[in-house]
Amino acid sequence: MQSIVLGFFAVAWLSLVAILVVEPEIYDSAMKLPAGRHILAELAFLGAISALIALLVVGVLRRWRWTFWLTLVAFLIGGALRIPASVLELAGVLPPAGPAWYVLFQALLGLVQVTIGLLMLAGYRRAGPWDNPVDAPR
């Protein structure tokens, strides 16, 4: 389970970097910055998210319980909300958060998050947080 979550974090971080390089306007709109190039703000945003991902990676590697539960809840709830939000954005009901490819990518990430969250829940029932039999529920 740890490797799946770490893999997702790696893909998420690489995606953030790729979006910054290819379509930095997405960062600008997420941070509600005026039109123009804001490289320092974008790099600060990437740095803050990178620090959060790094902390979560350390927590996964050390099998910290709080990171298990935080990741589980974020993946189940966040992922479940991303999917219908993306559908509503594509249907024109909600204003789009970016180009169509970005909205579709968000929906795909939501689907992957929910799937990983369900796998984490099943692993918890079987062998405890992070598939650690010592911490398995009795």
What do these predicted ranges mean?
Residues 1-138:
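Topology signature of small-to-medium multi-pass alpha-helical membrane proteins
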